[in-house]
Amino acid sequence: MAGLGLRLKAAKWTLRSGSGAVSREWSSEMGKGVRRFSTETENDVPTSGISRPLAEILKELNKKVPDSVIRTRVEDGCSIKYIPWHIVNRIMNMHAPEWSGEVRSVTYSPDGNTVTVAYRVTLYGTDAEIFRESTGTTSVDDKGYGDAVQKAEAMAFRRACARFGLGLHLYHEDAL
């Protein structure tokens, strides 16, 4: 269950600074974003937000992560590089502070040997929202840390973030 999505915000916000304010409205009309600008001079209150345009957020997430945060594990005799979920979480908080994540489904295989978690990560920029989904599957008999659902969720979360470019270079390093 992998998916891609882009949705324009159907919201209105006002940025006030200096002598005037700029009001910006977003709506979707048949998938096309419409901007409306107006100038206001009443109620001038300086405000600032933490949001940025999606292009800026994605540019930051696509940067190579430092080697110091990369971990390695051996799986089926192969060495695999990865970024722990809690580090991915901190990177998301730093570069996309208004992101959200949600478990979309938890599915056990018919034989009960594996569990798959589908996870969605949504980024909220000043201009739009965008989401990516991915899945993680693990054996219920895996004796490592945590339970199988936690492992599958962490895997799905990391993969969904990689769909935004975060740590994506790890998947291609060996091929270069």
Swiss-Prot record:
Cross-referenced InterPro entries: RAD52-like, Rad52_Rad59_Rad22_sf
GO biological process assignments: DNA repair; double-strand break repair via homologous recombination; Group II intron splicing
Localization, UniProt: Mitochondrion; Nucleus
Keyword set, alphabetical order: DNA damage, DNA recombination, DNA repair, DNA-binding, Mitochondrion, Nucleus, Transit peptide
Gene3D superfamilies reported in the protein's UniProt record: DNA repair protein Rad52/59/22
GO molecular function per UniProt: cobalt ion binding; double-stranded DNA binding; single-stranded DNA binding
Summary of the tissues where the protein is detected: Expressed in root vascular tissue, tips of primary and secondary roots, young leaves, hydathodes, stomatal guard cells, cauline leaves, flower buds, stipules, carpels, pistils and anther filaments.
Cysteine-cysteine disulfides: none
Domain of life: Eukaryota
The keyword DNA damage is annotated on this UniProt entry: yes
Transit peptide region: 1-37
Gene Ontology cellular component list: mitochondrion; nucleus
Keyword Mitochondrion: yes
Family (UniProt): Belongs to the RAD52 family.
Function (record text): Plant-specific single-stranded DNA-binding protein required for efficient heterologous recombination-dependent DNA repair in nuclear and mitochondrial compartments. Forms large nucleo-protein complexes with WHY2 in mitochondria. Binds ssDNA with high affinity, but with little sequence specificity. Involved in double-stranded DNA break repair. Involved in the hydrolytic splicing pathway in mitochondrion. Facilitates the excision of two cis-spliced group II introns, NAD1 intron 2 and NAD2 intron 1.
Record note on quaternary structure: Interacts with WHY2.
Record's protein name: DNA repair RAD52-like protein 1, mitochondrial
Source organism per UniProt: Arabidopsis thaliana (Mouse-ear cress)
Biological classification of the source: Eukaryota, Viridiplantae, Streptophyta, Embryophyta, Tracheophyta
